[in-house]
A protein has these predicted regions:
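Conserved nucleotide-binding/hydrolysis micro-motifs of P-loop NTPases
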Residues: 40-42, 64-67, 97-101, 126-129, ...
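Amphipathic alpha-helical transducer elements in NTP-driven molecular machines
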Residues: 41-44, 74, 78, 85, ...
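Signal for well-folded cores of large energy- and translation-related assemblies
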Residues: 15, 29, 33, 48, ...
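P-loop NTP-binding site
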Residues: 189-226
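Conserved C-terminal guanine-recognition region of P-loop GTPase G domains, centered on the G4
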Residues: 51-57, 76-150, 221-225
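Conserved G1/Walker A P-loop phosphate-binding module
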Residues: 1-90, 95
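Canonical P-loop GTPase G-domain recognition
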Residues: 117-118, 127-189
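Flexible glycine-/small-residue-rich
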Residues: 15-16, 62, 123, 217-221
């Protein structure tokens, strides 16, 4: 029987490079899909991950960070991220309380003001600051933009993630699931493996190679009990 109360929709994560977008996505779905690194612009492609519950299905689009591009690769990645803003039902803007609003944040605000999509401000890494500092940070952002919701979380420690998911569901339309309940990403296994290799390369050889490294897998063998 069809569930008329079921919700489904697309949600994009935006923010400065390295604020924890990929970490948040991995936390929500409970497994590692998007790679993380301390290098800017680790995420190059638009990755879809899927969260499904009894209430609905959320398809997350983890885009490259929005910033002012310094080269052709950066320009392409920013274009992909900004184009996504008009294609989704909800925008999650991920920030961290270590810095207040600067040129990068104002650039994102300019992009958000061009549309009418609900925007949820997600303040990540709340485990790294005191409550007084967090409240001051929230107040600063409230003065800059009329957010639909403001949700503090810690993606690393999985704090307040359930509350964030409830907030997202509020703004999704009613409709059927886009994927079956066992699907967690649209990425093929080969692509996920290639990204995991790239992550390790960026971490272990950060001084030897630029962050413009790419991985090409020629063959794969599946083994049990690894």
């Amino acid at each position: 029987m069809e569930n008329n109360a079921f919700k489904s929709g697309f949600v994009t994560l935006i923010g400065r490079p390295n604020v924890g977008k990929s970490t948040l996505m991995n936390c929500i779905i409970g497994q590692k899909i998007a790679i993380t690194s301390n290098k800017p612009q680790t995420t190059r492609n638009r990755i879809q991950t899927v969260y499904t519950s009894e209430e609905g299905q959320i398809v997350f689009l983890d885009t490259p960070g929005i910033h002012k591009a310094k080269n052709k690769l950066g320009d392409y990645m920013v274009t992909v991220a900004e184009k996504t803003l008009s294609e989704v039902d909800v925008i999650l803007w991920l920030v961290e309380p270590s810095n207040f609003i600067g040129a990068g944040e104002r650039h994102i605000i300019e992009q958000l003001k061009k549309g009418k999509t609900p925007v949820i401000l997600v303040i990540n890494k709340i485990d790294t600051v005191k409550k007084e500092q967090l409240l001051e940070y929230i107040d600063t952002y409230r003065k800059e933009y009329d957010f639909s919701e403001i949700v503090p979380v810690s993606a690393l420690k999985a704090e307040n993630i359930k509350e964030l998911l409830k907030c997202i569901m509020k703004y999704l339309p009613y409709g059927p699931a886009f994927y079956d309940e066992d699907t967690v990403t649209d990425q093929p296994v080969r692509q996920i493996v290639a990204e995991l290799i790239r992550e390790k390369t960026l971490r272990l050889l950060s001084d030897e190679i630029p962050h413009g490294v790419a991985v090409s897998i020629e063959s794969m063998k599946y083994k049990k009990n690894i």
